[in-house]
Every structure is written in structure tokens, then in C-alpha cells.
Amino acid sequence: MKQIEMLEMQIKEFTTALDNSQTSINHMTVFSEICKTQPINSADLTIKLDMEKSTINRLLHSLSENGRGKVKAAKLIDIKMDMKDRRHRIISLTTKGKSLMDKMFGEKHDR
């Protein structure tokens, strides 16, 4: 499959899974990074993606079990407190998130 076709398929899978008109490329960027490096703490994610902490937090909440404000919860990630440093959160994929990762990137994607 050509790279552009692969990317189109990944975007379609992602936007279908979120079923939300509020989906942005930033949501997919954050989700993709979590897929590559999970579990990851929120501070490391902020550094790796070179995004503001507030932006990362907003995106994480919309990808999580809870959602926030008008954004429907996607239930793709789980956010837990980092017991080593309570200022940070540990992010990992839920079962639904792992299923989407497999659809987007294939079964052999690193977990």
C-alpha cells in the first residue's frame, strides 16, 4: 500500500473511532505517540511533541475515559497518577485504544 493511501486509511480509522467533529490532527499526533511509547508520562509527551502542557492536557482528556466540556470521551487512553511524581500522569491505551492502534498501524506495531 502506498504511503499516502496508508495515511488516508489511518486518518479514516481514527476519525471514525472518535465519532466527533472536534477531532484534529493534534489528536491523532498525540494518539500515535502514545501508541509508540506507551506507557508514557504526560511531561515526556509534552517534550516529545513540543506542545504546551495545556494543549496536551486538553487533547488527553478528549482521548480519555472522561472527556471534558463539550468533547465526547473517546475512551482510547487511560490516565493514572504517576506514583513516583504526583505532578505527572501515566498514559496508556485502553482495550479500545489498542484495537484502534491495530487497525491503524497493523498487528505488529510495537506496544
Q: Where are the language model's segments positioned?
A:
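Short beta-strand "wing" residues that participate in macromolecule-binding interfaces
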Residues: 71-73, 79
